[in-house]
């Protein structure tokens, strides 16, 4: 491949759904359409348009997000590969980004499964998605679609919609689905994690209650849905219940616990660590921990598992929730680049970027309290052990 050749912009199974390298990170605004409380359906159905296999953890496949995936997404220019020879050897920044994606894949690929189902439906791809197997090119395409949630354009769009009310989100979904194209993935969040699903229809059991029908990769071919009460501005969703109408552990939330992400932001997404400026324009951290005793101090303020917003910086569970009780939760911290301090009191794995620093580390023990200080103008980290208690 020519080192200056940009990947083709197609939304398909093998070809990536991204454009080539260039910096990004401007804020995003949204336009909320009027709410039309009439039933609407896009024509997509979990079978045959969803995958027949369930959402899977990274350990379920021997495949990994690799240099070929990075080249498919961003091309093989100097910011991705160390030379023009094949195979590509990733630059330090590209390798760090790939490691972050692989860490994020630990709990599941629901984001990638939802995005690939939507894109294949829009492109009328064959064979039917339900007939595909979780191997080879299919698995790597799902990984690349999963990785789009870490692009600046995608994250900015998601943050903008997270500020809207649940009824605004229903209005946007209804307007989109009328076109016959499922343009949005849907994210729902609780303290136990986040999950990505694909809306394909909106029904109205009553005047003030919307039922958003979704393809849920945890339940292939299943009849799953998110219920939104327009009066209380609350939503409910059965994450783990076999019968979603009678789930004792149903997820509940309101404004800020539900968002949508347009497919267009993924198609126009750009390489987050490429461009004329050295380093990324935003801080992006992936924090994995079974405990909530961590915090991140940024120029905007401090965010944590229990305080998910400070200025332009947010901390939100990653949309890859595990069905295993007590499993570690992944959080995505995204915001203003500047001096960043990550403090944890127990085992925590962190991967990400801030300024020129791309890094990955794991603390050594649950009774060790540590702080990592990242300066965007430097390529080194300052590590402090705040205390250490023998077990």
Q: How should each PLM-predicted stretch be described?
A:
Residues 1-10:
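Bacterial N-terminal signal peptides that target proteins for export
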Residues 18-20:
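C-terminal motif of bacterial Sec signal peptides marking the signal peptidase cleavage site
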Residues 22-25:
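Bacterial signal peptide processing site
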Residues 30-136:
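Active-site-adjacent structural segments surrounding the nucleophilic cysteine of cysteine proteases
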Residues 116, 120-194, 204-207, 217:
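Conserved active-site-adjacent core of cysteine acyl-enzyme catalytic domains
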Residues 190-261:
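Active-site signature of cysteine proteases
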Residues 265-391:
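Extracellular glycoprotein-like low-complexity segments
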């Amino acid at each position: 491949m020519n080192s200056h050749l940009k990947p083709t912009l197609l939304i398909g199974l093998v070809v990536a759904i991204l454009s080539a390298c260039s910096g990004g990170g401007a804020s995003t605004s949204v336009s909320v359409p009027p709410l039309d409380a009439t039933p609407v359906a896009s024509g997509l159905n979990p079978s045959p348009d969803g995958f027949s296999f369930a959402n899977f953890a990274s350990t379920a496949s021997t495949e990994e997000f690799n240099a070929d995936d990075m080249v498919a997404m961003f091309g093989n220019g100097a910011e991705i590969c160390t030379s023009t020879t094949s195979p590509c050897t990733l630059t330090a920044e590209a390798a760090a980004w790939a490691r972050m994606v692989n860490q994020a894949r630990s709990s599941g690929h629901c984001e990638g499964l939802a995005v690939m189902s939507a894109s294949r439906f829009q492109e009328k791809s064959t064979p039917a998605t339900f007939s595909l197997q979780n191997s080879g090119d299919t698995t790597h395409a799902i990984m690349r679609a999963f990785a789009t949630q870490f692009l600046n354009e995608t994250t900015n769009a998601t943050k903008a919609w997270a500020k809207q009310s649940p009824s605004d989100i229903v209005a946007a979904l209804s307007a989109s689905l009328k076109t016959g194209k499922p343009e949005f993935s849907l994210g729902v969040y609780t303290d136990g994690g986040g999950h990505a699903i694909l809306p394909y229809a909106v029904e109205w059991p009553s005047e003030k209650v919307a039922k958003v029908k979704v393809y849920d990769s945890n339940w292939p071919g299943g009849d799953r849905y998110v219920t939104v009460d327009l009066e209380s501005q609350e939503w409910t969703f059965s994450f783990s219940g076999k019968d979603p109408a009678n789930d004792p552990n149903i997820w509940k939330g309101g404004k800020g616990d539900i968002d949508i992400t347009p497919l267009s932001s993924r198609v126009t997404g750009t390489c987050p660590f490429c461009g004329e400026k050295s380093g990324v324009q935003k801080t992006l951290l992936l924090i994995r921990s079974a405990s909530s005793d961590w915090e991140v101090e940024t120029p905007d303020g401090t965010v944590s598992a229990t305080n998910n917003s400070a200025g332009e910086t947010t901390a939100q569970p990653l949309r890859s929730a595990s069905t295993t009780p007590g499993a570690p939760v992944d959080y995505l911290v995204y915001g203003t680049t500047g001096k960043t301090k990550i403090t944890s009191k127990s085992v925590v794995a962190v991967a990400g970027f801030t300024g020129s620093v791309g890094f990955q580390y794991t603390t050594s023990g649950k009774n060790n309290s540590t702080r990592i200080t990242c300066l965007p103008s430097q390529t080194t980290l300052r590590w402090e052990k705040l205390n250490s208690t023998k077990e």
